[in-house]
């Protein structure tokens, strides 16, 4: 089932008929992505799993797409996807490619012409997450809650078991730099590496 997200009525219906996986699509403004970083935190763990099959941040009224704010909002949203990997099984940015002289919609991850390609800020967010995936989601909290926009900060953490690396993704959507202190608890010493 493809949707723009499941409301309560649809969630109950999908669970009742035994749907295993729903395909949710989000083409929304940056504010929506920031506001929905905690979207799956309270999701029914026994309900259908989620394929975030198409998502991209854009601001069509202003014509701004593939800018830094859009990429930042996607990075914030992706902390929630990663934190809830038990529910969100798959995710993909869309659309991926567009020719600068013949495109159907905007935004796109990579633009190209007959001689070259241009990677967008959104591309680099996807690359950062793709190159820093983990095997186990770690519980990361600020003041006892997931980091989903408090003080304009968003975060997720994973462990890459084969390498022993703890990988932290931290998004600062605020207008000023923030001093952040990370404390680890519950990890065995061999699981912590510097780098």
Question: What function would you assign to each model-found segment?
Answer:
Residues 36-37, 64-71, 105-112, 170-171, ...:
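Composition- and surface-driven signal marking solvent-exposed, interaction-prone regions
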Residues 47-155, 162-164:
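Aromatic/acidic polysaccharide-binding cleft in carbohydrate-active enzymes
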